[in-house]
Amino acid sequence: MLINFTKMHGLGNDFMVVDNLAGDITFNAKKITNLANRAFGIGFDQLLVVETSNIRGVDFRYVIYNSNGSEVEQCGNGARCFARFVNYKNLTHSNPITVKTRSNIISLHLNDDNTVCVDMGKPSFNPADIPLLVPQQSEYYQIEGFDLGAISIGNPHCVMLVKDVNTIDVNTIALKIQQSELLPNQANIGFMQILNTHEINLRVYERGSEETLACGSGACAAVAYGVEQGLLKKNVVVHLSGGDALIEYTQGGHIFLSGPAQFVFEGQVEI
């Protein structure tokens, strides 16, 4: 079957985006991993699929697959690309655009400068929502010998405070943490260096995709944790390898992610 696709990225976190409103395209893990291969396929961190919603007031179903073929709950950078895609393809003229992910409903607002602001919902520090198998909620948890904050942004995140993100062995540490029995669904692992109360450096090892140039939900998780710990103010610039994301979070409220979403190319591929 020959399908149309669009290649996009948000701060270097790259995506293959597909319109499946007709419901005639079926993906499986083998197809996805083949398409994600950067040497023999399209190459991407995540596959984003636009599907119809059966929920009143919700414009689309936003389906996300990691490059290993696993379906995941949330992707903030992908949400920005999703918004620009459905607008560019004239699939909707709504603004904001409301979409249903695997875990929750989020709102996407297109700005005049082609950036997108995503209402990522309310972060949860409840271990059951992550899930994290611990007896009670705490400011931090010791997992595989590391002190970590744990947060759900609709998907699971752990955050480690570090002095310098450039000297951390991200892959080795993240893989060790992900193997913990305390994290039955694993987690995205963020390494946060606080520069001041409005600015951080961040690297994120994404579950199912390894380290990426940017992770929107990871940026939200890091800022939410920093605000809750009194280390950050409500407006924070997050410096990622692929560029800067802007996060706004008031303790106990919703968290907002703003940043660019870029088109790279379009094409057709046999699946």
Swiss-Prot record:
EC number: 5.1.1.7
Catalytic machinery residues: 75 (proton donor), 215 (proton acceptor)
InterPro entries, alphabetized: DAP_epimerase_AS (IPR018510), DAP_epimerase_DapF (IPR001653)
Residues of the site described as Important for dimerization: 265
GO MF, one example: diaminopimelate epimerase activity
Places the protein is found: Cytoplasm
Function according to Swiss-Prot or TrEMBL: Catalyzes the stereoinversion of LL-2,6-diaminopimelate (L,L-DAP) to meso-diaminopimelate (meso-DAP), a precursor of L-lysine and an essential component of the bacterial peptidoglycan.
UniProt record similarity statement: Belongs to the diaminopimelate epimerase family.
Protein name in the entry: Diaminopimelate epimerase
Organism: Vesicomyosocius okutanii subsp. Calyptogena okutanii (strain HA)
